[in-house]
């Protein structure tokens, strides 16, 4: 038995629970939900000839011999779920005034909305993780419930994934005399387009700014009306806009996700990513595989939230949001990923 309508849940989800990580916001602005279980690249404008290399993963290893190129595939399915425990409605909520206690009906509503906030955050973390991996390496492993892990390879050129080593390592350079600008310009030549943004993790940024030449060239003045700076404003606590390095924006990203109750950084230590804010990052979604959604005519959607009571002795109430996300890059070579040393 449904408690809130899907329209009500979608409205609450969209208005209350905005989660906007850096890579999704800056690089993945196009959204394509499909009404089929599979995602068809040929149906996305401008991607008629695009195909991905997909390989099954068995016991943690990619089986390339069983892989192949495809332009249609099934995304992993995610559906975080919570139970609305009746006992929780009898306890005072953390922000409740002890002198003005709320009734159980109000608490139940608050618990439902908090559950949905947590479920939305869980899915958004998956989307951002896929987006970051696509930008960093041009491939990632997609997983889902009752879904065999599969590596999705977008075909990034080997020269676009760079690892500093030996004498080329910035850590071995003289911080007073060396200018890393030439290195950056050389790396940028591997990109298929113009580079207008560089994203560092905090440790990568600390290494970059340790050079005297960087401190002299970095323009930290605010007040620019450029489209790029406007796009980088108000990105939250996990993002810091450091200024312009020539005509390239410098951004530091310290975003995290939670895996097995442990906080982990999206960007590995000593990471530098060169890219363009006009790159075509694609948020694609397979259809919602739920009988209730089909009865309501909801097939092509990025999310399907639901709240229902399962009758029985006793009856139990649940919340859940379903999604089948797959983040893709139309051209993975628009980015150059550098592992600093």
From Swiss-Prot:
Coiled coil: 109-129
Pfam families: Phage_cap_E
InterPro entries in the record: Major_capsid_GpE
The keyword Coiled coil appears for this protein: yes
Gene Ontology terms: cellular component: host cell cytoplasm; viral capsid
Keyword Thylakoid: no
Record keywords, A-Z: Capsid protein, Coiled coil, Host cytoplasm, Late protein, Virion
Protein location: Virion; Host cytoplasm
UniProt superkingdom: Viruses
Family under the similarity heading: Belongs to the lambda phage major capsid protein family.
Functional summary from the UniProt entry: Assembles to form an icosahedral capsid with a T=7 symmetry. The icosahedral capsid is about 60 nm in diameter and composed of 415 major capsid proteins. The assembly is primed by the interaction between capsid assembly protease and portal dodecamer, and major capsid proteins assemble cooperatively to form the procapsid with the help of capsid scaffolding protein. Major capsid protein forms hexons and pentons of the icosahedron. Viral genomic DNA is packaged into the procapsid through the portal vertex. The packaging triggers a dramatic reconfiguration of the capsid shell.
Subunit composition and interactions: Homomultimer.
Name this protein carries in UniProt: Major capsid protein
């Amino acid at each position: 038995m449904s408690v809130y309508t899907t329209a009500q849940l979608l409205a609450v989800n969209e208005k209350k629970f905005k989660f906007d990580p850096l890579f999704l916001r800056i690089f993945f602005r196009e959204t394509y939900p499909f009404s089929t279980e599979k995602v068809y690249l040929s149906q996305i404008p401008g991607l008629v000839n695009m195909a991905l290399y997909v390989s099954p993963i068995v016991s943690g290893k990619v089986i390339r011999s069983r892989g192949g190129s495809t332009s249609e595939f099934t995304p992993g399915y995610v559906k975080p779920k919570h139970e609305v425990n009746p006992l929780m409605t009898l306890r005072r909520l953390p922000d409740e005034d002890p002198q003005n206690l709320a009734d159980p009906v109000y608490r139940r509503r608050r618990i439902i909305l908090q559950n949905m906030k947590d479920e939305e955050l869980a899915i958004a973390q998956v989307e951002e993780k896929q987006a970051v991996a696509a930008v960093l390496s041009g491939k990632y492993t997609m997983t889902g419930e009752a879904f065999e892990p599969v590596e999705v390879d977008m075909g990034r050129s080997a020269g676009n994934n760079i690892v500093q080593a030996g004498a080329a390592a910035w850590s071995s350079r003289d911080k007073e005399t060396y200018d890393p600008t030439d290195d950056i310009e050389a790396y940028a030549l591997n990109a298929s387009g113009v580079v207008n943004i560089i994203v560092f993790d905090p440790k990568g940024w600390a290494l970059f700014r340790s050079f005297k030449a960087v401190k002299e060239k970095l323009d930290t003045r605010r007040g620019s009306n450029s489209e790029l700076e406007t796009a980088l404003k108000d990105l939250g606590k996990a993002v810091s806009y450091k200024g312009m390095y020539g005509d390239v924006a410098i951004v530091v990203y310290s975003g995290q996700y939670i895996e097995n109750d442990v906080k982990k950084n999206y960007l590995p230590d000593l990471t530098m990513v060169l890219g363009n804010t006009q790159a075509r990052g694609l948020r694609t979604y397979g259809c919602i595989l739920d009988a209730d959604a089909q009865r309501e005519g909801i097939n092509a959607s990025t999310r399907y939230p639901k709240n229902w009571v399962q009758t029985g002795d006793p009856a139990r109430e649940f919340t859940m949001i379903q999604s089948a996300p797959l983040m893709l890059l139309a051209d993975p070579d628009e980015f150059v990923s550098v592992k600093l040393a």
